[in-house]
């Protein structure tokens, strides 16, 4: 029996085993985003998800030394998909609400926003006199809920599967006003071809709207890791660099 071969062979097996452990040690995390809420999440010309949400997810993954994948999912399918384990977390500019907290858990906020109306430049706007107006919003959002709670029976309400379709109907004249999160609307006004024809109407409200990363109910381990990584990118300036890439002011 050749002792050298035995020792060498054992060393190779040990090395392979350690390598396997090292590979397995990296957490595999699948994030879902919508891909239709620029500049927070959108699909680029190469078909890849990009945006503020995506950059934050990548920064968190780097801090956690995790093996991450970012996939897209229609808005209405995000929470159902999370619950059936299609993905591990949702980073899609999702507001932390009491209703959502009944079915998912959230990390600490990673930014805050508010709601704001938008309409054509020069059109008169009176929040207390919107009878007969056609107002649009994306379905299953805080904006849609606000309209249902306050304008059902008073104005014509239209809801859409994604924000891009809201903008399309506004430009086409099928909507008089839209209600949306202030920050993506700001981006649309600044960057779209039609943005110069429209303007904010009134001031922002519900500005305590905190946005978090959703995880499955009871997934405290992943929630804690994400919160720790978020604290780290806030402390070392990485968050601020990502913020500045998209907005000239802090959104935290």
Kindly give the residue locations of the regions a language model identified.
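Short helices/loops that flank or line small-molecule/ion binding pockets
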Residues: 62, 71-72, 76-88, 103-105, ...
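Short beta-strand-to-loop elements that line the ligand-binding cleft
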Residues: 67-74, 137, 155-163, 203
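Flexible hinge/capping segments at coil-to-helix
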Residues: 119-135
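Sec/Tat signal peptide C-region and signal peptidase I cleavage site
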Residues: 19-25
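Extracytoplasmic small-molecule ligand-binding "clamshell" domains
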Residues: 26-93, 236
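A ligand-binding cleft/hinge motif common to bilobed small-molecule-binding domains
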Residues: 77-80, 92-102, 148-149, 176-207
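Ligand-binding clefts/hinges and TM-proximal coupling segments of bilobed small-molecule sensing domains
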Residues: 142-160, 196-201, 230-252
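Periplasmic-binding protein-like
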Residues: 35, 111-116, 182, 190-227, ...
